[in-house]
Amino acid sequence: PGSPQKRAASPRKSPRKSPKKSPRKASASPRRKAKRARASTHPPVLEMVQAAITAMKERKGSSAAKIKSYMAANYRVDMNVLAPHVRRALRNGVASGALKQVTGTGASGRFRVGAVAKPKKAKKTSAAAKAKKAKAAAAKKARKAKAAAKRKAALAKKKAAAAKRKAAAKAKKAKKPKKKAAKKAKKPAKKSPKKAKKPAKKSPKKKKAKRSPKKAKKAAGKRKPAAKKARRSPRKAGKRRSPKKARK
């Protein structure tokens, strides 16, 4: 009689263990999900701090106490639990450049939003924009390359045309000196008879032959006193009248 009781008890123990453990696990999972849902009701602490500073718009910067009060009023958070996270966010934000500390040190003092915070958001959302910019840049480069090739071809054509014009101008200049040389050869032939005529015209103007007789006359005139001297010589001989003195 004892054996059938044991056999009946054995199947009862096996189903009791399995259903008891399964509902405990199922009951634990919704609590964890609820905790996760509660934690995800607010954005990251640094983003809340930046939003509080930009909303308050204080000239000298916002203090940690005012940032906490703004977060408690606008977000579903428990500041007693979140206070250490706010201090950590302030320190890390100043170190990374997302926040700028105007006065104070550490988590105390006044804070402003840094200039590095905006570019970070742009980088997160600009993954597709980067691809578009890369495509646009490639298209622009291709257009610039085509335009540069066209410009180079146009410049080459212009240079070739200019070279042809220069060659034609040089050929014309080389032909022109031949005509000038022929003209220069003709000019001396015309001047040669003029030079021969000039001495023939000047020869009759000079009256050297007429002046020669005047000189001869002058010479003859000068010689006349010599003849007078010859005539006077007999007078000198006549002075010898010594016999007249003797007669006295």
Curated annotation (Swiss-Prot):
Keywords of the record: Chromosome, DNA-binding, Nucleus
Which GO molecular function, any one, fits this protein according to its record?
DNA binding
Q: Where in the cell is it found?
A: Nucleus; Chromosome
Which residue spans adopt a coiled-coil conformation according to this UniProt entry? Answer: none
Q: Name one Pfam family in it.
A: Linker_histone
Q: Which residues form the H15 domain?
A: 41-115
Q: Does the keyword Oxidoreductase apply?
A: no
Compositional bias (Basic residues): 9-39, 118-248
A GO biological process of this protein is: nucleosome assembly
Q: List the expressing tissues.
A: Sperm.
Quote the function comment for this protein.
Answer: Histones H1 are necessary for the condensation of nucleosome chains into higher-order structures.
Which family does the record claim for this protein? Belongs to the histone H1/H5 family.
Put simply, this protein is called: Histone H1, gonadal
Q: Which species is this UniProt entry from?
A: Parechinus angulosus
What taxonomic lineage is listed for the species of origin?
Eukaryota, Metazoa, Echinodermata, Eleutherozoa, Echinozoa
